[in-house]
Amino acid sequence: RTNRNRNKITAKEQRELREKTIGIVGLSVGSAFAMSLAMERTCGALKVADFDDLELSNLNRIQTGIKNLGLPKWIAISRAIAEVDPYFEVEVYSRGLTSSNASDFFDGLDLVCDACDQVSAKALIRFEARKAEIPVLMETSDRGMLDIERYDQGVEGYLHGRISEEMLNDMMNANEWSPEFFNAFIDLSQASAR
């Protein structure tokens, strides 16, 4: 099924990638990442965390149909992955990423993708990734920014030094975004007008 990968990923690289486990927190935007990884088999297993149900407003970000409205996002995405590759391993965290399951979620990960909206989850991702020494990949829709935090290379601080220990703790206990938190993730002075 993946024989066309040979022109862009060598056989040796494919063998190495089969041993990798990638975590995705948030399955709206994260669903595209999950589907690409499954279609190309560019990792051996996925761990996905999302607690939300599929709503009509999600259909601009999730490639699915109205038949899946009301289902948990993880069910819709897991089914779509199984239709492409029924042998692809997907481990689901149906309550999303929480302080009670974060240690288990991060166990064995080689990379984590931050595709969630909750400020507390974003902070928890960075706290756990730094502890586990794995990179964080985050895409934001503002200006199409792709951010890579290399906690696997001994990086100090969080989000390239934009988040202090104190702010991270505040974020992990927050129920909503503050202007200060938002500015840490998207430099408001550089943000697009929209």
What do the predicted segments below correspond to?
Residues 18-55:
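Glycine-rich adenosine-cofactor-binding loop
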Residues 15, 35, 104, 123-127:
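Alpha-helical segments flanking ligand/cofactor-binding loops in enzyme cores
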